[in-house]
Design a protein with these regions (language model features):
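Transmembrane beta-strands of outer-membrane beta-barrel pores
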Residues: 3-9, 62-68, 106-108, 127-133, ...
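Residue-level signature of outer-membrane beta-barrel architecture
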Residues: 33-35, 104-106, 196-198, 246
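Transmembrane beta-strands of outer-membrane beta-barrel proteins
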Residues: 1, 56-60, 98, 119-127, ...
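Extracellular/periplasm-exposed beta-strand and loop segments of Gram-negative cell-envelope proteins
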Residues: 12-20, 67-96, 132-187, 219-235
Length: 249
């Protein structure tokens, strides 16, 4: 079992903005199963030694993470209609991932299992199938409809309205021809990670993992404005998780 904070790098907020990076953080959990080639299950003994068996494992897992998303940065802080609409625009995405990674341990898996050392660092690469369910609302309307019209409080005309979606987000390939899409979708993710195991006992380890998931879609967060310099990559996450691993006989 693994769990930890997820930093979602999306189209909400501003690239390389500290407030964005620290603000759009969710939480993820996962259930993990390992294929350990160093052992044979039928005899509960070591398998025939090969370099692959002693240095590689396959990790299969199911992950689920949720992140609430806000627009941070200088534009959202502007005291005008655009800034107001950005601050009022709230997002949320729920993501389910299923996939596998190949883990490489530079040190011997057998020696670590036998207690020769406490730490076993590793690197991994893999792929996940991803199902995502985003949402988007505005606090400027009682019904929260992000596709509706809102009053402009920065004019003297009480009937002056504009779209809840700001310019730059209001044209795209999403719902109603905008850069917002709250429909359920699916995609793939390429994953990389670095981490280490810490031996707690003969049959248990503590695992610390730093993970990057790069999605092959830019709609995972439900927001995909027209291509421009600030929208040059797809959505991705950085996930720091801690897990408990128990060895099954």
């Amino acid at each position: 079992v693994i769990a930890g904070p997820v930093a979602f790098q999306s189209d909400y907020g501003e690239r390389s903005n500290i407030e964005t990076n620290l603000g759009n953080v969710g939480f993820g959990v996962g259930i993990v199963h390992y294929l350990n080639f160093a052992y044979q299950a039928d005899c509960n003994c070591y398998a025939k030694y090969t370099y692959f068996n002693d240095h590689f494992k396959v990790r299969n897992e199911i992950d689920f993470h949720i992140t609430n998303l806000d627009n941070f940065g200088p534009e959202a802080s502007d005291n005008d209609f655009g800034g107001l609409r950005l601050r009022a625009h709230k997002g949320r995405t729920q993501v389910l991932e299923i996939g596998s990674q190949l883990e490489y341990f530079p040190m011997s898996i057998r020696d670590f299992s036998a207690g020769a050392y406490k730490f076993a660092p590793y690197v991994s690469v893999g792929a996940h199938f991803v199902s995502f369910n985003p949402s988007a609302t505005t606090s400027l309307r009682e019904d929260g409809n992000i596709f509706g019209q809102v009053l402009n409080p920065f004019t003297t005309d009480p009937t002056d309205t504009g779209p809840a979606i700001i310019e730059g987000f209001n044209v795209g390939e999403g719902q109603m021809g905008t850069g917002i899409d709250t429909r359920v979708g699916d995609t793939w993710a390429i994953t990389w990670s670095v981490g280490t195991r810490y031996k707690l006992g003969i049959l248990s380890d503590l695992n610390i993992d730093l993970r990057w998931h790069y999605y092959t879609s830019n709609w995972v967060d439900g927001l995909n404005p027209d291509p421009r310099p600030v929208n040059r990559v797809n959505d991705w996450i950085f996930w720091m998780n801690v897990g408990y691993i128990y060895y099954l006989d």
